[in-house]
């Protein structure tokens, strides 16, 4: 399956809407394939997040480093997930996070301006964004609640139960963090 087919399938599945041939051509014209090597950064703290990327292959971590040099992982991302510091991407402000490839990755990336001008008007993409926004809000609430009410071991077990496919690409110490 080519890179774009993975994106089409994802958008159509989440939105419940089919993409027309013309809409697919718009995607091809504006999303750019990019390869990111293991340990290479998609985004570094202090830089403005100019792109969002759809992960076709690979995995990444979003993290910050405290004043003592300790790494704090905020998010792990796998195939068919989006990469970006969305605050930086939408507000064009310096990022507070790093996004690093944990293995060789293939992504389809696009700029904020191109999303707004060409992609957002596509009904399936807009519907997909709404579903993602809802899912992200729910996930953030669940994560906050679990950090207050569950032990690390309980949170890990819930992750294994809810997302068994998610565990494979990552070492346990990353997931535990």
Name each model-derived stretch:
Residues 68-72:
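Short alpha-helix-to-loop micro-motif enriched in aromatics/charged/Gly
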Residues 42-47:
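Short phosphate-coordinating micro-motif centered on Lys-Gly-acidic
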Residues 39, 50-63, 79-80:
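Glycine- and acidic-residue-biased ligand/ion/polar-headgroup-sensing regions
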Residues 150-177:
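Phosphate-/nucleic-acid-contacting segments
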Residues 73-130, 134:
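Cyclic-nucleotide recognition modules
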Residues 1-32, 88:
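Cyclic nucleotide-binding regulatory module and flanking cytosolic helices
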Residues 140-151:
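Short, Lys/Arg-enriched, Trp-marked, Pro/Gly-tolerant hinge/linker segments that flank
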